[in-house]
Amino acid sequence: MNSVLIPRVRFACKLTFAILGALVLGFYLQLETPRWSAMTAAIVTSGPALAAGGEPFAGAIRHRGFLRVIGTFIGCIAALVIVIATARAPVVMLLLCCIWAGVCTWWSSLVRIENSYALGLAGYTALIIVVTSASSPLQTPQFAVERCSEIVIGICCAIVADLLFSPRSIKKDIDRAVSQLMLDQFALMRICVNSGTKEEIDKSWNNLVKSTTALNGMRGSLMMESSRWQRCNRRLKALHSTSLSMITQACETYLIMQSSPERVSPELKALFAEPAENVADVHRRLKQLRQMITGMHSDNVLMTVSAWTGAGTRALLLMKGIQTNSSISAIESGVLDGEVVVRPVSAERHHALVNGLRTFTATTIGCLMWLWTGWTSASGCVIIIAVVTSLAMRTPNPKGMAMDFIIGMLLAIPVGSMMFMLIMPATQQSLFLLCLMLGIFTFFIGIEVTKRRLGMLGLLAGTINILVLSNPMVFNVTSFLDNAMGQAIGTVIAMAVLLIVRDKSREKTGRTLLNRFMSSAVSALTTKAYRRRENHLPALYHQLNQLLVMFPNDIGKYRLALMLIIAHQRMKLAEVPVNDELSAFHKKIRNTADHVVSASGEGKRTYYYQRLLKELGEYQEKLVEYDAPLKVTEPVRRLTDMLQRYQHAFLA
């Protein structure tokens, strides 16, 4: 009980300190709108907690704060450029802001998720500044400077609060995860060698892929904590690739055992007879495997088992370095510098385009409503629309995030009304009483945010926004209710646009991912040494994880993707005869595979796919002509048969 309650109370204190510190500092520096600094502190502090479902690890708040500063400065510069260029045409000015917000949302959907926050923020910051200064364009530079000042103050307060209230380090969690990873790797190989059921294999490798991906995500959080983890970061990056390699080799062993169970000797099987109890047990078994493999003839040892043993040995070496954070030895240096990791290319281009279109459409509707009705609070409505659509588009569940804002903004009306009409007038302009009232409210909201309670983040931001905190405080009830209704209507409009502009890119993205798996397997055929050093496994498993998220119940897609990853790894290790004609054929096959991936219509895709199958058939004949060994011809034949058998999955 205490282990759960203490982090929640600590985070609630952190959130309260950050918001109150930003508010008091804003009043002290006589900022125009000190509530923006308080809102910044609230969003920067509570956002990572909502995503983590608890107190965020050390560094997460600082990283988010720096991204917010970058996004704010980019948005301010964009706003100044738009106003200077179109100050005499207000409609064009607002239209350009809507286009800018849509472009930023589109771009944020294509880049890495941890960096997309800055782009999303840049989109709606420009809109906020332009809308705020619409009545007096000459004051736009002043609004931009004030906006940046408020953001920086809010972020500084959030960082100070994060440092004061014992930020939780992720290092211990990484050490535990690394140890468990080695046990899970041995468990998967044990199931594969002993020819377990497909259900056991699917469950084991699925969990192992998820834990490997999670460990790589922890690596980013660790680097946010301190620069002293640089060595640990390098080892974790190498361990990620090594772990994926071990998963691939274990699954290939299973496929080989299904057709040729005699390929693994009884002596080797005996070492996988019993499960490993701890890391020391895994270390002992790997040592026995190395000794046994060394004493056997290479033709009698399955290549995947030998490669898995070597990768496991490297993983244990990296694990020890991760847990001690010691200096990198010469042996480790060879492991760390062995391969060049290739970054994945986004397959969600159509999805990103839909996200940008949603943001543009929603903000345009808000601006048109503002221009048509002349509603005094329509500007606040437009701002909320931009904020909700920009932030929601970056999440795996945009509708869920939008619903969180709707519930929060609706709850903010009664909660904010009680605070504005009853509690705040009773404070009699006392800053201490105001901070006490807001502190109690923020503390309980902070506890609920760590529980991922629906609507709490929206309630916190919405309440701070509609209170319009100023010094001295002006209690205009009509203006308050107008602002409250404006932000509530804005969230409803944003949700309506999300429902109307549907994202139908799921099937297209899934087919693109499968075609990229196919292309990577075919492209692994090479005689070039530099191409063999390229490590595509992290990118391939990243795309496999996307398939897991998009098609959680389609096990057939996972198995097909995994077989293509195995084919890629086998092709990469194949010793293709060095020959100019074969090298030219490799280039030709890669070019055709790229056309299959990039083909826009079904007709073109089918044409290039059939051409690829024909070229692979000709390539097999060339391999026989140049006396290629069975270790080369057999993987090519298996890949060709697989592409022939499952061509409906790549073309449908």
From Swiss-Prot:
Keyword Iron appears in the UniProt entry: no
Q: Which Pfam families match?
A: FUSC
Membrane topology per record: Multi-pass membrane protein
What's the main place this protein lives? Answer: membrane
Could you state a single Gene Ontology molecular function term? transmembrane transporter activity
For this protein, the parts annotated as crossing the membrane are 11-31, 41-61, 65-85, 91-111, 118-138, 368-388, 405-425, 430-450, 455-475, 480-500
Return the HAMAP family for the record: AaeB
Q: Cross-referenced NCBIfam families, in alphabetical order?
A: PRK10631.1 (NF007916)
Q: What is this protein called?
A: p-hydroxybenzoic acid efflux pump subunit AaeB
